[in-house]
Amino acid sequence: FLIPALKSWKMGQKILDIGPRWHKSKEGTPTMGGLAFIAACLVTSTITVAFIVALDGPAGSSALILTLALALANGAVGVFDDLVKFSHKRNEGLRASQKYFLQLVVAGLYLFGMYMTGNITTELYIPFVGIFLDLGIFYFVVALLVITGIVNSVNLADGVDGLVSCETVVVGIFFAAVSF
């Protein structure tokens, strides 16, 4: 439903002339297909939060709500990037520095919210040794790099054809496993 709609609205990707010739055949591949992932994330997360609130009360849901907000805000950065590409009728949206700055702001707000709600501390558990290492303020620097690195991992793996669903499933399974 979404891909045909994007094609009819001519929301296709422009291809730069600097790459291999076969890339030109991918011109017109719909952009903003990430909206489907954002919608799926929103629906499943909302259902999950509703179950957790019903079972444990609202106290246990703040981390989930903040993490959902993190995902949606990063999705919004991607949508904004695609809108810039579309409005300028070129393949270049936000500059990398602009996009990374927005991702840092989003991650920083997430970490601030998690810290203020008591969902994280500055301690890092070292497995197999069984000790906690208090990183202090450095914890947030490391966490910012980890969050933005994870956010960009799928983006960098996305090819010319925009078929990022396989990578997204792998990353989603990882996050599901880590969250439990």
Where are the regions a protein language model picked out?
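"…together with the soluble PPM/PP2C metallo-phosphatase catalytic core" -> "…together
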Residues: F1-F180
